[in-house]
């Protein structure tokens, strides 16, 4: 998705684990797009249903989390069919690489776009702080790498929310959630 948007001329596109595309705006990030993937496997192999939501225009009202539109990421937003074509072209290339080498084929590119690489973050679940530490991107399996007082934690669950920690707002001793494994 980020590749396709950049091919259209979008700038300041960043990624947030596990499935958001952000736009860097003055001093912050705003959600530009989200991706949901449902996987299933049977005797015929694996299948995926991929849903993509992309804001073409900024939202008309304030939302709980900052949101952006594609029109803010570029001069002159392209027509919808051009946006779809660019996204599908890049999606085909990414799925092909993933089929051969898994996430490791995309890891370096993902890390370069990672919004909070090397920054303090908080992992939230059910509106509670589960864990906080320094975010170091993702490993070859796509698990989030979070350095905490207990060491490097691998986060697998996509049912959590990752947020930056404002300066001076670190909690101490946040617990360890399900789906977190030390390395």
Where are these regions (language model features)?
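Catalytic beta-strand/loop module used to bind and position nucleotide/cofactor moieties
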Residues: 1-183
């Amino acid at each position: 998705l980020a590749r396709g948007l950049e091919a259209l001329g979008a700038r300041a596109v960043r990624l947030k684990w596990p499935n958001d595309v952000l736009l860097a705006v003055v001093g912050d990030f705003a959600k530009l797009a989200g991706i949901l993937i449902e996987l299933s496997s049977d005797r015929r192999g694996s299948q995926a249903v991929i849903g993509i939501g992309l804001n073409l225009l900024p939202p008309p009202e304030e939302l709980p989390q900052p949101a952006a539109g594609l029109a803010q990421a570029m001069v002159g937003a392209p027509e919808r069919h051009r946006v779809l074509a660019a996204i599908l072209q890049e999606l085909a290339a990414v799925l092909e690489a993933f089929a051969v080498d898994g996430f490791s084929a995309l890891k370096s590119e993902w890390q370069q776009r990672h919004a909070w690489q090397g920054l303090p973050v908080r992992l939230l679940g059910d509106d509670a702080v589960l864990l906080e530490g320094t975010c170091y991107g993702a490993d070859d399996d796509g698990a989030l790498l979070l350095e905490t007082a207990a060491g490097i934690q691998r986060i697998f669950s996509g049912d959590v929310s990752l947020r930056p920690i404002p300066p001076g707002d670190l909690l101490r001793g946040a617990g360890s959630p399900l789906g977190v494994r030390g390395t």
